[in-house]
A protein has these predicted regions:
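Non-catalytic C-terminal accessory region of glycerolipid acyltransferases
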Residues: 3-12, 100-232
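Short, basic, glycine/proline-bearing loop/turn elements
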Residues: 19-20, 86-92, 122-127
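A transmembrane-helix-recognition feature enriched in membrane-embedded lipid enzymes
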Residues: 1-37, 57, 78-87
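A generic secondary-structure micro-motif detector
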Residues: 9, 31, 69-70, 94-95, ...
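A structural micro-motif
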Residues: 28-30, 64-66, 87, 113, ...
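A secondary-structure boundary/capping signal
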Residues: 34, 70-71, 88, 118-119, ...
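Short gly/ser/thr-rich secondary-structure transition/capping motifs
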Residues: 25-32, 96-99, 157-160
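Catalytic core of membrane glycerolipid acyltransferases/transacylases, capturing the structured
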Residues: 37-96
Length: 232
């Protein structure tokens, strides 16, 4: 049982994470790289986003709780929103700057938490993904500069294979890896330049994962539509 030392506030989080790990572990092989050695918060986790399976797979790869940001639409219906908030998930609007979400995330960091963000702005693969050269959204740089907390780049590869039901029978590989921390932007520093550096760190980590884990072509990121069309 992971997370038993974290206190009462995280009991719902670990109950859900361990339940989902129990469901997903029989249908995929989860490989981790560096996730068990990370320090306690405050810091920010910035990861690419391939599929709806990413949050539980990422959470299950770490031995510390992560307070993820998730789009507000996922908090409906009301009972599911209650479950999400019980797991410390922070709702965020995507159409305009969400000052409430920013304040909540800053408060979590001040209290020593780890905040997880998907700075691509949604599910991305191919040319729209940071892993293939696309830019990141500005939210992560704003959160880092306001909090002064370091950002650790992370990469998940293979989770998109789970969109094809028959893949569950062959237990596809899913890799979750984390890189070295990147210091928050300094006051007056060009945030776009800082985001470009973070994006490059994520791409470099992706390259390391491909080499170290000898990933086959079928494991490399695809859109859900590409997965459904190929049946793999």
């Amino acid at each position: 049982w992971i997370g038993y030392k974290e206190g009462m506030v995280d009991l719902p989080y670990w109950a859900v994470v361990n339940l989902l790990r129990g469901i997903l572990s029989p249908v995929c092989r989860i490989e981790v790289r560096g996730t068990r050695e990370v320090p306690a918060g405050p810091w920010i986790l910035a990861c690419n986003h391939l599929s709806h399976f990413d949050p539980p797979l990422i959470a299950g790869a770490f031995s510390l709780p992560i307070d993820f940001l998730a789009m507000r639409e996922l908090f409906q219906p009301a009972w599911f929103g209650f479950l999400m908030r019980s797991c410390r998930v922070i709702p965020v609007g995507r159409k305009q700057a969400d000052t409430t979400a920013l304040k909540t995330a800053l408060d979590r960091l001040r209290s020593g938490r780890i905040v997880g963000v998907f700075p691509e702005g949604g599910l991305r693969a191919g040319k729209t993904s940071v892993l293939e050269g696309a830019p990141l959204t500005e939210g992560v740089s704003l959160l880092a500069s306001r909090s002064g907390c370091p950002v650790r780049p992370a990469v998940i590869v293979g989770s998109d294979q789970l969109y094809v039901a028959r893949n569950w029978l062959r237990r596809p590989r899913v890799v979750v890896a984390i890189g070295k921390p990147l210091h928050a932007p300094l006051r007056g520093q060009d945030r776009k330049e800082w985001m470009a550096r973070l994006a490059e760190e994520m791409r470099s980590l992706f390259g390391e994962v491909k080499r170290a884990h000898r990933l086959e072509e079928v494991v490399l990121p695809k859109t859900p539509q590409e997965r459904w069309k190929s049946g793999r």
